[in-house]
Amino acid sequence: MAGGCALKVLVAPLDWGLGHATRCVPVVREFLNQGAEVELAVVRSNAALLRNIFPELRQRLAPSYNIVYPKHGYNMGLWLVKNGAHLRTVMNYEHSFAEEVVDRYHYDVLVSDNRFGFYSRNAKSIYMTHQRRIAFPRVLSAFEPVGMLWHASVMKRFDEVWVPDVPDLPGYAGTLSHVKKCPVPIKYVGALSRFEGEKLTEKSDVRYRFVAVVSGVEPARARFEELLRKTLVKIPGRHAVILGKPSLGVKSSNEQNLDLFTHLPDEQFAAVVKNAEWVVSRGGYSTVMDMAVLGARCVFVPTPGQYEQIILGRDLAHEGYAVTIDESKLSTETLLAAISEKARVALPKPEDDNNLLKDAVYATIHSRISSH
């Protein structure tokens, strides 16, 4: 930031699915609203989505983690151990990339959404994560302290940690985000959704019984899509399946009682979801926050091997906020039985005005201004 120019911010979401990119949207908007100049560090899998939302913002191609999820449940913890060398290589590469772009383009602030190596000694570096506790299934619980120590070592490289949740338990992420100790200053910045604060005026012409939202990384995404199609086609009524393929543009087709969409812009997505009786989706944390903002009644189907999603689904079901079904048990019969038993579930709606995020951005901007 030189010669009175606006604070220059680079926002970098992790490329493990699109959820990290979508929850960065309100962060980008808030920095822009408060006068900062914002650019985006993207990979090929999230570039199209972010370009659709922010066509005016410059994008820089960042290193990709190239993650492929394990096919079977409860393997993610062991997968991380097995692929530790790959992660370290990417972290070192992205750290070099971060230092290079800060030196070349003079960024004042880096915002890393779960990118473990995206920090710089020459810029304020903010690490955003809801998963302060890295949870493992019971059979691998001995690894949990090791996972937390490793994550703490990652966070120590940053100047600040932002947690997309409310400060008080249970919040939306429960014990995953509410951990007593943190090695660096921590700020809760509220639930973050790309639909937050937006005036969503578009209305859907169709009242769907189920809207299925497909997301995640291959091959888990394709497997989930196939399962949802087989499940919903047997249920009377009209259903929509949003395939989670923004790189293909906005295309639609019909198969029997299913309306298929490759991708939907935010206004259309919100209209379809808000006009649905039920939404069936993965239980990723960004999806949970989006559905809370849109007031959806949800059936969450955790991605096999992602114990974080299993814990989130279990905790949300315990609080009466949502229904959860294991992918291995999802069928026409189990889906209909689950919603008949939990007809009154509802996610708590976040506050319309997220002052936690506003305050965090304001403090960041003014701390950098005062240091120059």
Which ranges hold each PLM region?
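Short amphipathic alpha-helix
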Residues: A21-F31, N46
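C-terminal amphipathic helix plus adjacent low-complexity
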Residues: A337-H372
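Active-site-proximal region of nucleotide-activated glycan assembly enzymes
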Residues: L57, R121-Y188
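Conserved nucleotide-sugar phosphate-binding/catalytic loop shared by glycosyltransferases and other
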Residues: A6, D15, N33-A85, D259-L260
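A donor-sugar binding/catalytic signature common to diverse glycosyltransferases
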Residues: Q268-I311
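A short, glycine/small-residue-rich beta-strand->loop->alpha-helix junction that serves as a flexible
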Residues: P13-V25, P219-A222
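Conserved nucleotide-sugar donor-binding subdomain of glycosyltransferases
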Residues: N75-G117
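Donor-nucleotide binding loops and adjacent catalytic segments primarily
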Residues: V28, L176, K187-W278, V288, ...
